[in-house]
Amino acid sequence: MKKTALLCLLALLIGAAAGLTLNLSALKGEGLLKSEGGIPLEAPPQGSPVEGPAQTANDTEPQQGNAALLMAGEQVLDALQSDNVEALAALVDTERGVTFTPYSTVDSQNDLTFLPDQLVGAATSGTQYAWGYTSGKGDAIRLTLPEYMKSYVYNAEYSSAPMIGVDHVIASGNSLENVATAYPDAHFVEYYFPGRTPAAAGLDWCALKLVFAQDGGSWKLVGIIHSEWTI
């Protein structure tokens, strides 16, 4: 997590604007800190970077806004990594709750939303919820909250993700990327892993978007979006 905090400071020094993409491999001399933007309404080819003009949800001052947003993202990742639902619930917007999206396309009518106390209760209730449908087969995703978290939230060590995007979709599959329209008053941080095994030829990439809205001057979690290659 210290590495991410260092990147926050680097972003401030470089004066990165909204639409920031942090390439963590830059610390090893393998890339550069770059500012790119774009949230397409139609998905590009599988796993390809998303290019285009920056689209931000509001007029939050870029340098301070990005630093605070990245810090909020770190807090959520800490809670997810330690499987601490109580800590996660404390970061959720008390009125809007947090909406879970199993694939990139946000479905405001069907995606499940939990208020903080509901989130804590669901963690221990053993109740299976209908989260949506699997890519390809179209089977119903019926899982308990802990099971869903393992498969569709913290399915990779996102606290060590090699690339981080602020209001920027780094890569996408066949699914529609509609985070900007689904959350017009919010900002998001995307944590991205490229293909992790050579045999998969890049098709095993994955990403986690954490969507935040301002509440009383602080960022509160309102959405968690899982992305991966889809059929």
For each of these PLM feature ranges, what is it?
Residues 40-46:
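Intrinsically disordered, low-complexity, repeat-rich polar/charged segments
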Residues 4, 8, 15, 21-33, ...:
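C-terminal-biased regions
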Residues 84-88:
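Solenoid-repeat scaffolds in large eukaryotic assemblies
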Residues 67-83:
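Short, aromatic-enriched amphipathic alpha-helices that serve as compact interaction elements
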